[in-house]
Amino acid sequence: MKTQFAVLIISMILMQMLVQTEAGFWGKLWEGVKSAIGKRSLRNQDQFDNMFDSDLSDADLKLLDDLFD
């Protein structure tokens, strides 16, 4: 009886540790999904239009190319 009780307590502790670890992971994943398809993010998609405008000169691109080589 004592052994069964000890196994039960240990398994409950391990299960609690597992649930807390996964809750952190799933919580971060849910926040990412929510921010990707939420009302605010869908409304503010036009802020990414400026990402594709190249304000870099040829000299800047050459310097970046040299840095990454």
UniProtKB/Swiss-Prot annotation:
GO terms for cellular component: extracellular region; membrane; other organism cell membrane. Its main location: secreted. The keyword Nucleotidyltransferase does not apply. Keywords: Amidation, Antibiotic, Antimicrobial, Cleavage on pair of basic residues, Cytolysis, Hemolysis, Membrane, Secreted, Signal, Target cell membrane, Target membrane, Transmembrane. It is found in: Secreted; Target cell membrane. Expressed by the venom gland. The modification Isoleucine amide is found at I37. Residues 1-23 form the signal peptide. GO terms for biological process: defense response to bacterium; killing of cells of another organism. Residues 41-69 form a propeptide. Belongs to the non-disulfide-bridged peptide (NDBP) superfamily. Short antimicrobial peptide (group 4) family. Is highly capable of inhibiting antibiotic-resistant pathogen growth, including methicillin-resistant S.aureus. In vivo, shows high antimicrobial activity on a S.aureus-infected mouse model. Antimicrobial peptide that is rapidly bactericidal against Gram-positive bacteria. This is Amphipathic peptide StCT2. It comes from Scorpiops tibetanus (Scorpion).
